[in-house]
């Protein structure tokens, strides 16, 4: 076994040993023995020992109610520790991804070696780099914030232990700290008692900024600058920061009645307060460091006589005073006090930037570049990346809410019912009103609560400091009037600038119509004048996959993007595609580099804007070093996609994709929508109903409280199938379609697509990853334990289908086993399976006990309920992505 895996395995083994000691201290030898027996049986079962597999099932079925929770917690905590070790491994000197910042150097060298690219072209591509990461509070981050903090500390311990020069005494101290942290985690309840509020979610986002991004972003820019200097002789300008962060936490009200206008207003203030808090810490350091006397005449003129003896300090102290006054005012506002704005209130980034940049220029001019390029440069870059708002907010609302609000207004005004008008009539009315100088809203009108909420939200946007709200996203957008309606409501609220409004196309039909909708919009003169040559469109990955299956959805997403790129290029519009990806494959998740290089040519010209969801935020940005690594990967992928775009697919490949799309969609919908047994099977074979009890996000799991699979959100839909290891939404239909095309004699064509078309090879790679995490015997066990015998044939049919799908994908990829080209991921899945399997078996047992109690009309046993929640969290940790 090579060194990188042995280092990971030895850390995992060491952490497991410490956890074992903790369990023994807390609960006694007998519980540890029980856990160890189960672990050994699971390992042997994985190696193919059928007798031990049966013994594993019997042992877990026979656990007493008192043993359930300790056993569930032991395996769940072990998986959290394994994930922590793996995250550390990805940035450790012994890990294969330790050189991830090197990924930029590798990309630059690759670009320089292209005969048709020169340094000037590469430099231009660097200067136009734009990456906006949108943090969303999807309810897939199952781990509590308090435990995330402890995992970060454990990571630090692993780092110290890796130091070859560590003295025995220091090693002893670090091991002691490690034991304390693992004991603290064991004695902490891993399941939240209450759902987080939208404000709690926003605070979780601010914690990511403070604990990781605040340091990670300047570190990434130093790394980028170093590689550019070395490879191109090019220095990044001080004010060049290609990365920005936006958040949906506190702004996303789609289907979440808990996010109100008042909540958004509060989160905007809280975000500004947090920014002042973090910048105050920076300025405090600069006051201490910038004790220099030499300064340029310009700086001396700025500080006057009073500050001449220590000009830099003087300026920093003045800035500190402004930050403190701003923070006090924001604190009062957060408490609900209405105070007049103080003189010098910081509302714009320039107010922070100017004194800092004046110091920077003076230090450079006076031969103190080494000092200027230290902490001061990091702070300047933070001003550009985070600034006064810290993170900007997107507002997201469903299109029908705007339609209903306008319907209520037109009915009150006696001019008809907007909701029942044709699309042409809606557009004519909206354009007329957008061009009108008089207000539309009557003065003393009392709207319904729902309409008032929509109007109040628009008012919050109009009143927010410019630059603190990034975009207004319209979910379930279907028509040009959906976009114009939002512009009209914003105009009525008194907005004084052109707010980017992004339609989100998310079902199969909407993706197919996206280009037509945008073409109609761009043909409206008023609209063209408003957008000033820039347009953002959001592509939905989760709902389209839930609607049509993963193969049809991914092709519809590709075609929609391709058509939009060409339409905007023809119209001279700079298009920013906003990707609403999830962490799991069924919601569009894929390794960043592969995913970006598989997009249509030209899709990243306007930069990359992408959601980072739930638990993926922790995996990709949980530590400063991991942040550097993730941002470096994105940077290299954007540069490569823009300078070495993938080829346009051949027409014959497009025809094959059309074919695959139709067959896979028919297969997927044939089961999910048309098979009468499917919904009862889904409800019994997965913990879908029990998931509702988990206090995950602030958003309800269903768009409508009643209703079947259609009303279920994409996240719980995927989460449920991930739990029982069938992973159904991420593959159903895809393999059947591939098999049919192979039978039609087109296997060699598929192999060529896999070899020469990044879009197709990435799709197959994603399927392989899903297949690696799926498990036939576990899915079968859930059926045996939980599903009515009349539904067993459907379960068997689906498992047989999965087995066939694996064979066809391996044949097309010319591989003998899954993940052959990504052994690191295969190793990681293998490592965790030994600990995830017992949790799956135990979960099926707990679901059986819980449902039996309910059928008998007895009140639930809290030990069973609590253990069930722990297994759900544990399996999520084992799968490394939930929804």
Swiss-Prot record:
Gene Ontology biological process terms from the UniProt entry: carbon fixation; oxaloacetate metabolic process; tricarboxylic acid cycle
UniProt key word Transferase: no
InterPro entries assigned: PEP_COase, PEP_COase_bac/pln-type, PEP_COase_Lys_AS, PEPCASE_His_AS, Pyrv/PenolPyrv_kinase-like_dom
GO cellular component: cytosol
Membrane spanning residue stretches: none
Catalytic activity of the protein: oxaloacetate + phosphate = phosphoenolpyruvate + hydrogencarbonate
SUPFAM superfamilies in the cross-refs: Phosphoenolpyruvate/pyruvate domain
Gene Ontology MF term list: magnesium ion binding; phosphoenolpyruvate carboxylase activity
Needed cofactors: Mg(2+)
Keyword annotations of the record: Allosteric enzyme, Carbon dioxide fixation, Lyase, Magnesium
Family: Belongs to the PEPCase type 1 family.
Oligomeric and partner information: Homotetramer.
Main function: Forms oxaloacetate, a four-carbon dicarboxylic acid source for the tricarboxylic acid cycle.
The protein's name: Phosphoenolpyruvate carboxylase
Native species: Salmonella typhi
Gene: ppc
């Amino acid at each position: 076994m090579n060194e990188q895996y042995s280092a990971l395995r030895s850390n995992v083994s060491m952490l497991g040993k410490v956890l074992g000691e903790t369990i023994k201290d807390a609960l006694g030898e007998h519980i540890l023995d029980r856990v160890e027996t189960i672990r050994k049986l699971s390992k042997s079962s994985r190696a193919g020992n059928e007798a031990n597999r049966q013994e594993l099932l019997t042992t877990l079925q026979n656990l007493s109610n008192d043993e359930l929770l300790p056993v569930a917690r032991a395996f769940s905590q072990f998986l959290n520790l394994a994930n922590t070790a793996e995250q550390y491994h990805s940035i450790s000197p012994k890990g294969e991804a330790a050189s991830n910042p090197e990924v930029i150097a590798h990309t630059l060298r690759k670009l320089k070696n292209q005969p048709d690219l020169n340094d000037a072209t590469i430099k231009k591509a660097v200067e136009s780099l734009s990456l906006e990461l949108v943090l969303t509070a999807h309810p897939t981050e199952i781990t509590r914030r308090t435990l995330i903090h402890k995992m970060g500390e454990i990571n630090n311990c692993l780092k110290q232990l890796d130091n070859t020069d560590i003295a025995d005494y220091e090693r002893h101290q670090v091991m002691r700290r490690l034991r304390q942290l693992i004991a603290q985690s064991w004695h902490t309840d891993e399941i939240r008692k209450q759902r987080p509020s939208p404000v709690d979610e926003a605070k979780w986002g601010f914690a990511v900024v403070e604990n990781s991004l605040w340091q990670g972003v300047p570190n990434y820019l130093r790394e980028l600058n170093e590689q550019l200097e070395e490879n191109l002789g090019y220095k990044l300008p001080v004010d060049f920061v290609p990365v920005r962060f936006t958040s949906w936490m506190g702004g996303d009200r789609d289907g979440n009645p808990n996010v109100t206008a008042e909540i958004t207003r509060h989160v905007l203030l809280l975000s500004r307060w947090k920014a002042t808090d973090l910048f105050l810490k920076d300025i405090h350091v600069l006051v201490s460091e910038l004790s220099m006397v030499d300064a340029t005449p310009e700086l001396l003129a700025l500080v006057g006589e009073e500050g001449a003896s220590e000009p830099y300090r003087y300026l920093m102290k003045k800035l500190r005073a402004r930050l403190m006054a701003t923070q006090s005012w924001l604190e009062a506002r957060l408490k609900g006090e209405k105070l007049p704005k103080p003189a010098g209130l910081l509302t714009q980034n320039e107010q922070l930037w100017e004194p800092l940049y004046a110091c920077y220029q003076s230090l450079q001019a006076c031969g103190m570049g080494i000092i200027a390029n230290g902490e001061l440069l990091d702070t300047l870059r933070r001003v550009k990346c985070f600034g006064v708002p810290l993170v900007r907010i997107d507002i997201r609302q469903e299109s029908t809410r705007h339609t209903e609000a306008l319907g209520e207004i037109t009915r009150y005004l006696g001019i008809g019912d907007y909701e029942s008008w044709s699309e042409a009539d809606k557009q004519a009315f909206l354009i007329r009103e957008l061009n009108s100088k008089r207000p539309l809203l009557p003065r003393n009108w009392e709207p319904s609560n729902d309409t008032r909420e929509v109007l109040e939200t628009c008012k919050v946007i109009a009143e927010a400091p410019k630059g603190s709200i990034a975009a207004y996203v319209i979910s379930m957008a279907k028509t040009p009037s959906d976009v114009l309606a939002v512009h009209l409501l914003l105009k009525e609220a008194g907005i004084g600038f052109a707010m980017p409004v992004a339609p989100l196309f998310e079902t199969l039909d909407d993706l197919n119509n996206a280009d037509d909708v945008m073409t109609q919009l761009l043909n409206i003169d008023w609209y063209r004048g408003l957008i000033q040559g820039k347009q953002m469109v959001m592509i939905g990955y989760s709902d389209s996959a839930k609607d049509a299956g993963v193969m049809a959805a991914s092709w519809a997403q590709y075609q929609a993007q391709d058509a939009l790129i060409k339409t905007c290029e023809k119209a001279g519009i700079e298009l920013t595609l906003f990707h609403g990806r999830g962490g799991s494959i069924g919601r569009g998740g894929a390794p960043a580099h592969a995913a970006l290089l598989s997009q249509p040519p030209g899709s990243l010209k306007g930069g990359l804007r992408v959601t980072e969801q739930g638990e993926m935020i922790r995996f990709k940005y949980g530590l400063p070093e991991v942040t550097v690594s993730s941002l470096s990967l994105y940077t290299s992928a954007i540069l490569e996609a823009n300078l070495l775009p993938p080829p346009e697919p051949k027409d014959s490949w497009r025809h094959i994709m059309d074919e695959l799309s139709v067959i896979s969609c028919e297969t997927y919908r044939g089961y999910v929508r048309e098979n009468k047994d499917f919904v009862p099977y889904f409800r019994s074979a997965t913990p879908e109903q029990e998931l509702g009890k988990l206090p995950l996000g602030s958003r309800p799991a269903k768009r409508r409280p009643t209703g079947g699979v259609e009303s279920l959100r994409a996240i719980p839909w995927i989460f449920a199938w991930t739990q029982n290891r069938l992973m159904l939404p991420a593959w159903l239909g895809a393999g059947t379609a591939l098999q049919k095309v192979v039978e039609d004699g087109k296997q060699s064509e598929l192999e060529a697509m896999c070899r020469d078309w990044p879009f197709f090879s990435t799709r197959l790679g994603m399927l392989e990853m899903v297949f690696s995490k799926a498990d036939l015997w576990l899915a079968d066990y859930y059926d045996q334990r939980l599903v009515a015998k009349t539904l067993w044939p459907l379960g068997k049919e689906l498992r047989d289908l999965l087995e066939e799908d694996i064979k066809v994908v391996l044949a097309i990829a010319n591989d003998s086993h899954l993940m052959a080209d990504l052994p690191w991921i295969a190793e990681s899945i293998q490592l965790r399976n030994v600990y995830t399997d017992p949790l799956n078996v135990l979960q099926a047992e707990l679901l059986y006990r819980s449902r039996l109690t309910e059928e008998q009309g007895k009140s639930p046993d809290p030990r069973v309920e609590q253990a069930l929640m722990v297994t759900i969290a544990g399996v999520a940790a084992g799968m490394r992505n939930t929804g």
